[in-house]
A protein has these predicted regions:
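Long, hydrophobic N-terminal alpha-helical segment
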Residues: 1-43
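Beta-strand elements of well-folded, non-transmembrane domains
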Residues: 17-21, 36, 62-66, 103-107, ...
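Short amphipathic alpha-helices in soluble, non-transmembrane regions
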Residues: 28-31, 70-78, 141-144
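Acidic, Ser/Thr- and Gly-enriched intrinsically disordered low-complexity segments
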Residues: 35, 55, 65-80
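Short, charge-patterned binding micro-sites
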Residues: 42-66
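Glycine-rich, aromatic-bearing surface loops/beta-hairpins
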Residues: 101-148
Length: 148
């Protein structure tokens, strides 16, 4: 398993995008494929929104190694922002790390963190590999420090 930092890693990860019928689904699928790397399948499901309009959920599920590769696609400035802007607030009680990547930037091959709640995003969720005696925050910090 690819390790970054002081032998820190993730168990698995996923990226998910919610899109409307007017969005270019193929561009979103290609963007997620770039973000995840080779060997990760991208699935697209057509659904109806709560108001009945057609919508799509485009998602990927990754192994630990694939997840770590995906994190290397983040722009350096985004990694630094994650480290400076409260990494703890991105980790939930189940030791999942949550990220939001700007979809417009992603479609241009850039893994930029989204800080704007009104933009379309790819939502990332990564299960941190935390063992007894470790804190989820320290594991996540070590991963991102290893990426800088």
């Amino acid at each position: 398993m690819l390790r970054i930092g002081q032998d820190m890693s993730v168990h698995r990860g996923e990226w998910r995008v919610h899109a409307s019928a007017v969005d270019d689904i193929r561009v979103i699928e290609d963007s997620l494929a770039w973000l995840c790397g080779d060997g990760v399948s991208i699935s697209t499901q057509k659904e109806k929104s709560t108001l009945g309009a057609p919508m799509y959920t485009i998602s990927s599920s990754m192994t630990g190694k694939q997840s770590m590769f995906s994190l290397t696609r983040l722009e350096r400035v985004s990694i630094e922002e994650i480290l400076l802007s409260g990494l703890e607030s991105r980790i939930d009680e189940h030791k999942f790390l949550h990220l939001r990547i700007d979809l417009a930037a992603l479609s241009m091959g850039k893994g930029e963190l989204s800080l704007n709640k009104d933009t379309m995003v790819a939502k990332g969720r990564f299960k941190l590999e935390v063992y007894p005696g470790q804190s989820a925050y320290e594991v996540a910090r070590s991963i991102f420090e290893g990426l800088v």
